[in-house]
Design a protein with these regions (language model features):
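A structural signal for multi-pass alpha-helical bundles of membrane permease subunits
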Residues: 2-294
């Protein structure tokens, strides 16, 4: 029996196919551009190889040479140290954020009282009402508490339960049959063991999905490191500064040329793309049905 597709389904398929092809073309252009070289005097805007060959194949494959120049082009660190700072910042902040959110959501879903309802209301209100103008006060508070310019300080500051992921965890725990908890209590488990040995293992795939999404958010974040971690440059911050011609050695301002910027873009995006490809099924499946599955 042949499957019939409606015109709407066919139209959506064509649109999504064109969108995927468009994104692949852009990624291919980034790779080709990052492999091209720079010739000429940037200060006088003389023609170089890139403007003369915008979309064609590179005459020489210079990607690794460009990366090597970028590695030596910053006045305050190498790419390896920036990558280390990025991993510490992204992994630490993601773990603190997701663990705190998961535990608070479990407690509010398990123990229903006025306080848990207040916490739920605070989360919803903070998502609806934008908080504007608090950045200066937050920076001053971080300095007063000795959290400023410390990666572990950022871990503590990101250890909060506010945001959409609280609602996801809350929905998951709320949908769990109470029989699990009652059976564990009959077997002699206390509240701590019920949480760690029963509830949390049941949401491990939802936890992993949310952790990966939050990790990608922090990996691509350059604003917070720029404001709070001036001595711990991340790759995303390096990309921003390079594109603006900041923190480059005096004789290497040409690194803000497009081929070199695209090479840094690859360094920032390729790890995330690999991570997403490896865990794509886990990401798309568990989070989308996180409120229905235990």
């Amino acid at each position: 029996m042949k499957t019939k597709f409606s015109p709407l389904t066919i139209g959506l398929f064509v649109i999504l196919t064109l969108y995927v092809l468009f994104m692949l073309v852009i990624f291919a252009w980034v790779i080709l551009t990052a492999s091209k070289g720079y010739y000429g005097d940037y200060s006088s805007f003389e023609p170089d190889l890139y403007p003369d060959n915008l979309i064609g194949l590179p005459k020489e494959f210079l990607l690794f040479d460009n990366i090597s120049e970028i590695n030596n082009g910053f006045s305050d660190g190498t790419l390896l140290s920036m990558a280390g700072n990025t991993v510490l910042y992204a992994v630490g902040c993601s773990l603190c954020k997701v663990i705190v959110t998961c535990v608070v959501a479990y407690l509010c879903a398990r123990y229903e009282n006025w306080f848990s309802r207040l916490v739920y209301s605070i989360v919803v209100v903070t998502m609806i009402i934008p908080v504007v103008g608090s950045q200066a006060a937050e920076i001053q508070m971080a300095k007063d508490l000795q959290l400023y310019n410390r990666i572990w300080g950022m871990w503590l500051m990101r250890s909060n339960f506010l945001g959409m992921y609280y609602l996801v965890f809350y929905s998951v725990f709320k949908s769990m049959p109470k029989g699990y908890y009652e059976a564990a209590k009959i077997d002699g488990a206390n509240d701590w063991k019920i949480m760690t040995n029963v509830a949390l293992p049941l949401v491990k795939y939802t936890f992993l999905s949310i952790f990966l999404i939050v990790f990608i958010e922090y990996w691509n974040d350059y604003l917070i490191p720029n404001l709070y971690l001036p001595e711990y440059k991340t790759l995303s911050l390096a990309l921003y500064q390079q594109s603006q011609g900041q923190e480059l050695k005096g004789d290497m301002t040409y690194l803000q040329q497009v081929p070199y910027v695209m090479a840094t873009v690859l360094l920032v995006t390729v790890p995330v793309i690999i991570l997403f490809c490896v865990f794509s099924k886990r990401l798309m499946g568990n989070l989308s049905v996180g409120g229905l599955k235990g």
